[in-house]
Amino acid sequence: IDAEYVRMMVSEYERVLQENPNLGILGPTILNATQQEEYHSYIRKKQYQGDGFLRKENIISSGSCISCKILEKIGFPDSRLFLDYVDSEWCWRAHKRGFICGQTDRCQLSHQIGIKTIHLGVMQDILSAPKRYYYQYRNFLWLLHVKYVPRYWKLTNAAKLLLRPFYLPFVTSHITPYYIYMLRGVWDGITQYKKYKNHK
């Protein structure tokens, strides 16, 4: 990210904010660093709201723009969820407080998410480093208990997490570390939930 990108993103934030006073966070259009194609959801349809502004329930926080006043109202990202779903949880919390989130197609950011994208019919998944699966499984089980987390996200991610042990052997030859971190994530997701719930 260079100075020109920052200038453009701040300008876009101010422009979109004028049309949407309840804007919580604005992100760029994220492009796959390898293929230079936009990351998108096969399930959630695009909802453009204004010139170049795409309203979304959650965005990738990389390269995004947010004001300090918004952080005072919504709070900071939940560090208890390190490392996965942190930006998604913040966006859902913002929606709960009456704010909207979205991205602009006037700013683009080349960004590599995980190792590669896996296409699974109507769904897609990201192949990540083995250790990331610990946080994904643990945090998913924790977020299942959070009421403001969208039901569709819980259902689609439940399907992904259940299917992963079956299709990962076909996309990576080093499957054992993946299984180990998945099992650790499930264990801690169940046994440490009370600690997550009670720790502020």
Residue ranges and their predicted role:
Residues 3-40:
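Conserved donor NDP-sugar-binding/catalytic core segment of glycosyltransferases
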Residues 70-75, 80-108:
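A short, conserved alpha-helix in the catalytic core of glycosyltransferases
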Residues 104-124:
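Active-site donor/metal-binding and catalytic loop motifs
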